[in-house]
A protein has these predicted regions:
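Alpha-helical transmembrane segments of multi-pass small-molecule/ion transporters
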Residues: 1-212
């Protein structure tokens, strides 16, 4: 649970922020900044949590090793995207509508394929860790919304920050879990959270789209 809680948001939050009529520019900026910082922060949180909770890290692996793997999984794609955006600004801007539509289609295809292909595992994951994943996800969404309400004046920013808090980078969490532990049980909360967050976030988007 600490692994998925420590994981930064992913690009999914950018797509859903667009669906929710939120502040997309803020969402992209937050994703980029947090992804860069996560290389240092996530290993620190996970290693300290494992030590505090008395969980044995079964593999001989260092924080530096994990940080380097995270750099290639999270940071490199962000840097690459920023470089492409700066070099091809006019082209990207002219194709914004097409890119947005493709993002919608790809998101829906991934969402549906996960449920169709992994249905047997989904039942197992939800049974074992669904409740804690749901509580964590909803807590982060509401905390993000009301913290943003206190600090910002715009509803678009509140939508954005709620989704940034509620949506985690499941791929990164799986990478960290598989690198540190040999037992698949440590991946169950991550898998359950990924399934829960997609579902709750879609409902959240449908609700907040009506709020202006």
């Amino acid at each position: 649970v600490m692994i998925i809680a420590a994981a930064p948001g992913g690009v999914t939050s950018n797509i859903l922020t667009k669906f929710a009529d939120g502040d997309v520019a803020l969402s992209v900026s937050l994703t980029a900044i947090v992804s860069l910082l996560s290389v240092l922060i996530v290993p620190l949180i996970v290693f300290n949590s494992a030590d505090f909770l008395g969980v044995e890290i079964t593999k001989e692996i260092s924080m530096l090793n994990i940080a380097m793997k995270m750099f290639f999984v999270v940071t490199v794609p962000v840097i690459f995207g920023m470089i492409v955006r700066s070099l091809m600004t006019d082209f990207i801007v002219s194709k914004t509508l097409i890119i947005q539509r493709l993002s919608v289609i790809l998101f829906l295809l991934v969402f549906i394929s996960i449920y169709v292909e992994e249905w047997d595992r989904i039942v197992s994951f939800i049974t074992r860790a669904g409740l804690i994943a749901f509580i964590l996800n909803m807590t982060m969404i509401f905390v993000g919304y009301y913290v943003a309400k206190f600090w910002t004046s715009g509803i678009a920013q509140r939508k954005c920050i709620s989704l940034e808090c509620g949506l985690q980078n499941g791929t990164l969490a799986v990478v960290v879990a598989t690198q540190l532990f040999n037992d698949i049980v440590y991946m169950v909360p991550t898998a359950a959270y990924a399934l829960v967050m997609f579902t709750t976030s879609i409902f959240f988007v449908l609700i907040v789209r009506k709020i202006n």
